[in-house]
Curated annotation (Swiss-Prot):
This is Uncharacterized protein SJCHGC06055. Its main location: secreted. Keywords: Disulfide bond, Glycoprotein, Knottin, Secreted, Signal. InterPro entries: UPF0506 (IPR021712). GO terms for cellular component: extracellular region. Disulfide bonds join C59-C73, C66-C77, C72-C82. Glycans are attached at N18, N44, N98. It is found in: Secreted. It holds the Pfam family UPF0506. Residues 1-22 form the signal peptide. The presence of a 'disulfide through disulfide knot' structurally defines this protein as a knottin. Transmembrane segments: none annotated.
Length: 107
């Protein structure tokens, strides 16, 4: 029990020292990053990874790994990838045909 408490206090102290010395400071545009809490980009910038290394950019191009729409230049993150903002024509046709069917059934 005491060992666990000691490890917790030691870890907290090390993190406090590292944060105060700036070892975990956020990175500016163009600087290297790794998309971790210890090596992150500042503000609205996001880390564009290639393998395990990356650099801070204002937004991610189509095809890059993403978590949120705001990270993508196209503002569309779908299935963990930045996608084109355009909705495929096939989906539009399906929606239109389903909508027409609903209207006909309602009348």
């Amino acid at each position: 029990m005491w060992k666990l408490l000691f490890i917790g206090i030691l870890f907290t102290s090390i993190c406090h020292i590292n944060f105060s010395e700036g070892l975990f400071k956020c990175k500016e545009l163009g600087q290297s990053c790794r998309r971790t809490v210890f090596d992150r980009c500042c503000g609205n910038a996001t880390c564009q990874l290639q393998g395990l290394k990356g650099k801070c950019v204002s937004c991610l191009n189509i095809g890059h790994l993403c978590w949120r729409n705001e990270q993508c230049c196209s503002q569309r993150c779908h299935r963990l990838r930045c996608r084109d903002k355009k909705v495929p024509t096939k989906i539009i046709n399906v929606i239109q045909s389903n909508f027409s069917t609903i209207i006909l059934k309602a009348n």
